Amino acid sequence: MNTNPASVTIPDNPVQVHHRTLDVEGVGVFYREAGAPDAPTVLLLHGFGASSYMFRALIPVLAQRYHVVAPDLPGFGQTDVLPGAGFDYTFDRLAAVIDAFTVAKGLDRYALYVFDYGAPVGWRLAVNNPHKITAIVSQNGNAYEEGLSAGWADMRKAWAEPTAANREALRRFNTLEMTKWQYTEGVNDASLIAPETWQLAHAAIERIGVEVQMDLLLDYGHNIQQYAQLHDYFRRHQPPTLAIWGSKDPFFLPAGAEAFKRDNPQAEVRFLDTGHFAIETHGAEIAAAMLAFLDRSIGS
């Protein structure tokens, strides 16, 4: 019998996470914010099948030393396009809104955490505003052709031939079953993943509209066309970079993480024995690695 249980220390000033909305270019951008505003900022960008909710455990940890801001991208979570605004769901447009959001928030310099769809949004911010980026953490946020698995075959076909039939073939990626699969595939113990993660994500897809997600899947090919420009940014600016990757991601291969070192030799690469949504199963490891990396790279 253990007579010396580990003690639990409750901080004198526990981190409070604020939930706010900011109107930007006809979009009501919902975001989570925590930490001292005068501390170095970390901007968290989620991906497909998710929202800022995926950072619910990470934010309080980072906010002990950093100012943390996590918006929901247009088309996801609690962010809403205002009536009559009109909106083209492309990655250029998503990035323009998030860029305007950072300006409205007064985020002059920030470290980026990018995941999945958040990566092409974040890459555009970095390429267009290299002076604002203090560091990069990529958690299964792809930037290289070799990082794309065979799971992209249907998308590649639709990019090459954007017919109505090829577009319709992408609809299956937006079902509840597929969303759940993206959370659980490659995970050793699926009981670690709370079911509300994929349920909330799918509810948002249905509320906002499946066609929005179809538009983004079709537009993803344009991100690959911009890789050369992104690699030039990496070579020229050498931002402190940590690629921390679920090694059994069905869409983004480990080779995509290793490739960061080609253009940025000082990039740090780490692998976790899990799938795409590594933060759901290895959140503590990611938080610890991020804090150590950010402390080395930008201080607090």
Task: Name each model feature, range by range.
Residues N2-V29, A34-P37, T41, V69, ...:
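Flexible "cap/lid" subdomain of the alpha/beta-hydrolase fold that forms the substrate-access gate
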Residues L44-G47, A70:
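Structural cue for short, hydrophobic secondary-structure segments
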Residues G47-A50, D116:
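Active-site glycine-rich loops that stabilize anionic/oxyanionic intermediates
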Residues G49, P74-G77, A143, G275-A278:
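Alpha/beta-hydrolase active-site loop signature
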Residues G49-A57, V68:
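Serine-hydrolase catalytic-loop signature spanning alpha/beta hydrolases and amidase-signature enzymes
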Residues A63-D72:
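Active-site machinery of serine-nucleophile hydrolases
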Residues T274-A287:
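Catalytic histidine-centered segment of alpha/beta-hydrolase-like enzymes
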